[in-house]
Protein backbone atom coordinates (compact mmCIF):
# COMPACT_ATOMS: atom_id res chain seq x y z
CA UNK A 1 0.00 0.00 0.00
CA UNK A 2 0.93 3.64 -0.35
CA UNK A 3 1.76 4.03 3.35
CA UNK A 4 4.33 1.23 3.35
CA UNK A 5 7.93 2.27 3.83
CA UNK A 6 10.23 4.22 6.11
CA UNK A 7 9.38 7.88 6.60
CA UNK A 8 11.66 10.45 8.26
CA UNK A 9 10.38 13.75 9.66
CA UNK A 10 11.18 16.67 7.35
CA UNK A 11 9.32 19.61 8.89
CA UNK A 12 6.50 20.63 11.23
CA UNK A 13 3.69 23.15 10.97
CA UNK A 14 2.16 24.56 14.19
CA UNK A 15 3.47 21.55 16.16
CA UNK A 16 4.56 23.49 19.24
CA UNK A 17 1.10 25.12 19.53
CA UNK A 18 -0.47 21.67 19.28
CA UNK A 19 1.79 20.32 22.04
CA UNK A 20 0.95 23.35 24.18
CA UNK A 21 -2.79 22.66 23.73
CA UNK A 22 -2.09 19.06 24.79
CA UNK A 23 -0.63 20.41 28.05
CA UNK A 24 3.00 19.54 27.31
CA UNK A 25 5.49 21.77 29.15
CA UNK A 26 7.79 24.21 27.36
CA UNK A 27 10.98 22.16 27.69
CA UNK A 28 9.35 18.99 26.32
CA UNK A 29 7.76 21.03 23.51
CA UNK A 30 11.16 22.38 22.45
CA UNK A 31 12.65 18.87 22.51
CA UNK A 32 9.60 17.34 20.83
CA UNK A 33 9.84 19.73 17.90
CA UNK A 34 13.26 18.21 17.12
CA UNK A 35 12.59 14.54 17.87
CA UNK A 36 13.99 13.18 14.54
CA UNK A 37 10.97 10.88 14.31
CA UNK A 38 11.16 8.01 11.85
CA UNK A 39 8.10 5.88 11.04
CA UNK A 40 8.30 2.47 9.42
CA UNK A 41 4.86 1.40 8.23
CA UNK A 42 3.84 -2.03 6.95
CA UNK A 43 0.29 -2.84 5.92
CA UNK A 44 -1.11 -6.32 5.39
CA UNK A 45 -4.80 -6.06 4.52
CA UNK A 46 -6.49 -4.26 7.41
CA UNK A 47 -3.57 -4.84 9.80
CA UNK A 48 -0.80 -2.30 10.31
CA UNK A 49 2.59 -2.51 11.97
CA UNK A 50 4.15 0.88 12.76
CA UNK A 51 7.61 1.31 14.25
CA UNK A 52 8.30 4.73 15.75
CA UNK A 53 11.94 5.64 16.35
CA UNK A 54 12.88 9.03 17.81
CA UNK A 55 15.34 10.73 20.13
CA UNK A 56 12.99 9.80 23.01
CA UNK A 57 11.79 6.28 22.40
CA UNK A 58 11.52 3.35 20.06
CA UNK A 59 8.21 1.50 20.02
CA UNK A 60 6.29 -0.86 17.79
CA UNK A 61 2.53 -0.59 17.43
CA UNK A 62 0.26 -3.13 15.79
CA UNK A 63 -3.36 -2.32 15.06
CA UNK A 64 -6.27 -3.48 12.96
CA UNK A 65 -8.46 -0.95 11.19
CA UNK A 66 -11.63 -0.26 13.17
CA UNK A 67 -10.43 -2.05 16.32
CA UNK A 68 -9.91 0.01 19.49
CA UNK A 69 -6.47 -0.21 21.10
CA UNK A 70 -4.45 1.54 23.80
CA UNK A 71 -1.55 3.88 22.98
CA UNK A 72 0.76 6.18 24.94
CA UNK A 73 2.27 9.34 23.49
CA UNK A 74 5.97 10.09 23.99
CA UNK A 75 5.09 12.38 26.94
CA UNK A 76 3.19 9.56 28.66
CA UNK A 77 -0.34 10.70 27.77
CA UNK A 78 -2.50 7.58 27.53
CA UNK A 79 -5.06 7.24 24.75
CA UNK A 80 -7.66 4.77 23.57
CA UNK A 81 -9.01 4.72 20.03
CA UNK A 82 -8.92 3.25 16.55
CA UNK A 83 -7.66 3.96 13.04
CA UNK A 84 -9.99 3.69 10.04
CA UNK A 85 -9.40 4.04 6.31
CA UNK A 86 -11.42 6.85 4.74
CA UNK A 87 -10.68 6.94 1.03
CA UNK A 88 -6.89 7.30 0.80
CA UNK A 89 -6.54 8.63 4.36
CA UNK A 90 -5.86 6.83 7.61
CA UNK A 91 -8.02 8.56 10.22
CA UNK A 92 -7.76 7.99 13.96
CA UNK A 93 -9.98 9.16 16.75
CA UNK A 94 -8.38 8.78 20.17
CA UNK A 95 -9.77 9.70 23.58
CA UNK A 96 -7.40 10.85 26.28
CA UNK A 97 -7.73 8.71 29.40
CA UNK A 98 -6.86 11.59 31.75
CA UNK A 99 -9.49 14.12 30.63
CA UNK A 100 -11.77 12.41 28.08
CA UNK A 101 -10.91 14.91 25.32
CA UNK A 102 -10.59 13.77 21.71
CA UNK A 103 -7.40 13.79 19.64
CA UNK A 104 -7.85 13.25 15.91
CA UNK A 105 -4.98 12.14 13.68
CA UNK A 106 -4.93 11.84 9.90
CA UNK A 107 -2.22 10.25 7.76
CA UNK A 108 -2.23 10.77 4.01
CA UNK A 109 0.20 10.65 1.12
CA UNK A 110 0.49 14.03 -0.62
CA UNK A 111 2.89 13.93 -3.56
CA UNK A 112 6.02 12.22 -2.24
CA UNK A 113 5.32 13.04 1.42
CA UNK A 114 3.44 11.43 4.28
CA UNK A 115 1.46 14.21 5.97
CA UNK A 116 0.31 13.55 9.52
CA UNK A 117 -2.29 16.01 10.80
CA UNK A 118 -3.27 16.32 14.46
CA UNK A 119 -6.36 18.13 15.71
CA UNK A 120 -6.89 18.74 19.43
CA UNK A 121 -9.12 21.33 21.09
CA UNK A 122 -9.37 23.34 17.86
CA UNK A 123 -5.59 23.42 17.28
CA UNK A 124 -4.38 21.80 14.06
CA UNK A 125 -0.80 20.77 13.39
CA UNK A 126 0.92 18.98 10.53
CA UNK A 127 4.09 16.92 10.41
CA UNK A 128 5.65 16.19 7.03
CA UNK A 129 7.70 13.04 6.39
CA UNK A 130 9.82 11.99 3.42
CA UNK A 131 10.88 8.47 2.41
Predicted feature locations:
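Hydrophobic small-molecule pocket/channel-lining residues, especially in calycin-type beta-barrels
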Residues: 1-131
Amino acid sequence: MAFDGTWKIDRNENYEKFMEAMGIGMMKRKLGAHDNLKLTIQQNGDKFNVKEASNFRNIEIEFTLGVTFEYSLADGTELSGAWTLEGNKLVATFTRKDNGKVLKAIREIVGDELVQTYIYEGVESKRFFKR
